[in-house]
């Protein structure tokens, strides 16, 4: 009697990345049976019995892939940079999927003269979830900062005097404007990447590679449509 192989596991987070991954899965002929928004389940089947999804926090996707609890996953460049800090090895990132695009930016209150503060060599307090990216950015510019790690409601920090500036993801800038903030620098463009457990690629490559190829085709289509 043959024993069926366990399904491949794809780690995803709820929200924009999940929604923008659906067309990529469709490119491979795979449909999602249940939505994480309407289901309490954290392990979701797909129309392909050889693939299941696990729904985790965005910041946890690289950890699940690194330790083999997921064969592959999709995570933002911002998350991957923070995950790589303090990690001995690097995750295999074969494909930029060109989804969930935004930018990592510095923002301040409308009435704060950021350029003057930087020019005068002031030591700035900066609130962010993206400590590694912020540290590298300000160090490269020779700006002295004290970094304050927050996990949410970043826009509040300058308004109540906790920080002079924030480093956060920006899409349209609407949330910044609604809270009386403005962008002053773009640190880097952000998009989501496909990441793969290297052991899975070696041991389950025959099953995994067709999916990777389908993601590659779909991501190229995304890039072509945006060019």
Curated annotation (Swiss-Prot):
Q: What keywords are assigned to this protein? A: Amino-acid biosynthesis, ATP-binding, Cytoplasm, Glycosyltransferase, Histidine biosynthesis, Nucleotide-binding, Transferase
Q: Which PROSITE patterns match?
A: ATP_P_PHORIBOSYLTR
Which Gene3D superfamilies does the protein's record reference? Periplasmic binding protein-like II (3.40.190.10)
Location(s) in or outside the cell = Cytoplasm
> Which Gene Ontology cellular component terms are annotated?
cytoplasm
Superkingdom: Bacteria
| Pathway(s) the chain acts in | Amino-acid biosynthesis; L-histidine biosynthesis; L-histidine from 5-phospho-alpha-D-ribose 1-diphosphate: step 1/9
Q: Which Pfam families match?
A: HisG
Do you know which SUPFAM superfamilies this protein is assigned to?
Periplasmic binding protein-like II
Q: What is this enzyme's EC?
A: 2.4.2.17
GO function term, MF aspect, one: ATP phosphoribosyltransferase activity
GO terms, biological process: L-histidine biosynthetic process
Major subcellular site:
cytoplasm
Q: What class of enzyme is it?
A: transferase
Reactions accelerated catalytically: 1-(5-phospho-beta-D-ribosyl)-ATP + diphosphate = 5-phospho-alpha-D-ribose 1-diphosphate + ATP
Quaternary state and partners of this protein?
Heteromultimer composed of HisG and HisZ subunits.
Report the sequence similarity comment from the record.
Belongs to the ATP phosphoribosyltransferase family. Short subfamily.
Xref: HAMAP family: HisG_Short
The record describes the protein's role as: Catalyzes the condensation of ATP and 5-phosphoribose 1-diphosphate to form N'-(5'-phosphoribosyl)-ATP (PR-ATP). Has a crucial role in the pathway because the rate of histidine biosynthesis seems to be controlled primarily by regulation of HisG enzymatic activity.
Entry's free-text remark on domains: Lacks the C-terminal regulatory region which is replaced by HisZ.
Q: Know the name of this protein?
A: ATP phosphoribosyltransferase
Gene name of this polypeptide: hisG
């Amino acid at each position: 009697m043959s024993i069926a192989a366990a399904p491949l596991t794809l780690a995803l987070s709820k929200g924009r990345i999940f929604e923008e991954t659906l067309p990529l899965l469709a490119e491979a002929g795979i449909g999602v049976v249940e939505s994480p928004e309407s289901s309490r389940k954290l392990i979701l089947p797909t129309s392909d019995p050889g693939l299941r999804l696990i729904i985790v926090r965005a910041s946890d996707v690289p950890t699940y892939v690194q330790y083999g609890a997921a064969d592959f996953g999709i995570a933002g460049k911002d998350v991957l940079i923070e995950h790589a800090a303090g990690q001995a090895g690097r995750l295999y990132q074969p494909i930029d999927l060109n989804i969930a695009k935004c930018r990592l930016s510095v923002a301040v209150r409308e009435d704060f003269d950021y350029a003057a503060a930087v020019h005068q060599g002031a030591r700035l307090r900066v609130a962010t979830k993206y400590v590694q990216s912020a540290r590298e950015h300000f160090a490269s510019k020779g700006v002295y900062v004290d970094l304050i790690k927050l996990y949410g409601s970043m826009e509040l920090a300058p308004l109540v005097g906790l920080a002079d500036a924030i480093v956060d993801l920006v899409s349209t800038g609407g949330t910044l404007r609604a809270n009386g903030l403005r962008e002053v620098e773009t640190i880097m463009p952000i998009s989501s990447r496909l990441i793969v457990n290297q052991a899975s690629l070696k041991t389950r490559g025959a099953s995994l590679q067709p999916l990777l190829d389908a993601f590659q085709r779909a991501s190229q289509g995304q890039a072509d449509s945006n060019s």
